[in-house]
From Swiss-Prot:
Keywords for this protein: ATP synthesis, CF(0), Hydrogen ion transport, Ion transport, Membrane, Thylakoid, Transmembrane, Transmembrane helix, Transport
GO CC annotation: plasma membrane-derived thylakoid membrane; proton-transporting ATP synthase complex
Entry's Gene Ontology molecular function annotations: proton-transporting ATP synthase activity, rotational mechanism
Keyword Flavoprotein attributed: no
The protein's name in its UniProt record: ATP synthase subunit a
UniProt keyword Ion transport, yes or no: yes
Principal subcellular localisation of the protein: membrane
Assigned protein family: Belongs to the ATPase A chain family.
Source species taxonomy: Bacteria, Bacillati, Cyanobacteriota, Cyanophyceae, Acaryochloridales
Membrane spanning stretches: 33-53, 92-112, 130-150, 196-216, 217-237
PROSITE patterns: ATPASE_A
Domain of life where this protein originates: Bacteria
Primary gene name: atpB
C-alpha cells in the first residue's frame, strides 16, 4: 500500500486552485485558455464518435452504432415529451447537441486525469466547471426559445407578458432573466462542487476513499446534463405553445 501512495504523491499533480486561470490574449480580449483546451477535446471526441458510428451504417445496428441510436431515441423521446408531437422534430438536433456536449463535458471532469497536466497558471478541468461555458449555454437556450416563440406565433408571442393580466408584466420580464441564471448557475455550481470535493479527497486520502465519491459524481453529472436538456426543451415548448387556445390548438 505504501509504495502505491508514494507513487501517487510523486506524480506532478497540478495545484488545487479556484479562481486562477490560464489566460490567452486575442488582441485586447483575454480568454480562459484552459476552457478552450478542454472544450476542443470534448468536441473532437464527440465528432470522432459520430464519424465512427455513422461511417458504415448497418440495417441491424451493433456496437457504437447501436449506442448512438439508443442515445438519439432517448433524446427524441425527451424532446417530444416536452414539445409535443407536432413541433419536436426540428428541435431534436439542438436539444441533443446540448445534452451530449454537457454530458461528455461533465464526465470528462471525473474520468480524464486533467490534474496530471500542469499549466503555467490555473488547471485543466471540465468545461462546465467554468461559469463562462454554462452562461454561454444558457444564453443559447434563451435565444432559442425567443426564436421559437416568434417563429411560431409572430408578434402574438409578446402577449404572454400581459396574460392573464397586465399586472404580471414585471414578473414575466423578470422570468426571462431568471431562466438563464438558474440554468447556468445550477450546472456550474454542481460541477464545480463535485470536482472540488473529489480533488480535496484525492489530495488528503488518495486511491480508494475517493472512488465512491467519484461514482456519485458521475451519476450527478449525468443528471445535470439531463436536467439542463429537459429544461431547455420545456422552455422552447412553452414559447411555442403560448396560453390557453394556442396550447389546445397545438395538441388537437
Amino acid at each position: 500500500m505504501m509504495p502505491l501512495i508514494d507513487l501517487w504523491t510523486a506524480l506532478p499533480l497540478a495545484k488545487l486552485e479556484v479562481g486562477h486561470h490560464f489566460y490567452w490574449y486575442i488582441g485586447n480580449l483575454r480568454v480562459h485558455g484552459q476552457v478552450f483546451i478542454t472544450t476542443w477535446f470534448v468536441m473532437a471526441l464527440l465528432i470522432a464518435v459520430a464519424f465512427v458510428a455513422s461511417r458504415n451504417i448497418q440495417r441491424v445496428p451493433s456496437g457504437i452504432q447501436n449506442l448512438m441510436e439508443y442515445a438519439l431515441e432517448f433524446i427524441r423521446d425527451l424532446t417530444k415529451s416536452q414539445m409535443g408531437e407536432h413541433e419536436y422534430r426540428a428541435w431534436v438536433p439542438f436539444v441533443g447537441t446540448l445534452f451530449l456536449f454537457i454530458f461528455v463535458c461533465n464526465w470528462s471532469g471525473a474520468l480524464v486525469p486533467w490534474k496530471l497536466i500542469e499549466l503555467p497558471e490555473g488547471e485543466l478541468a471540465a468545461p462546465t466547471n467554468d461559469i463562462n461555458t454554462t452562461v454561454a449555454l444558457a444564453l443559447l437556450v434563451s435565444l432559442a426559445y425567443f426564436y421559437a416563440g416568434l417563429r411560431k406565433r409572430g408578434l402574438k408571442y409578446f402577449t404572454k407578458y400581459i396574460e392573464p393580466t397586465p399586472v404580471l408584466l414585471p414578473i414575466a420580464i423578470l422570468e426571462d432573466f431568471t431562466k438563464p441564471l438558474s440554468l447556468s448557475f445550477r450546472l456550474f455550481g454542481n460541477i464545480l462542487a463535485d470536482e472540488l470535493v473529489v480533488s480535496v479527497l484525492v489530495l488528503l486520502v488518495p486511491l480508494f476513499v475517493p472512488l465512491p465519491v467519484m461514482v456519485l459524481g458521475l451519476f450527478t453529472s449525468a443528471i445535470q446534463a439531463l436536467v439542463f436538456a429537459t429544461l431547455a426543451a420545456t422552455y422552447i415548448g412553452e414559447a411555442m405553445e403560448g396560453h390557453g387556445g394556442d396550447h389546445e390548438a397545438a395538441h388537437s
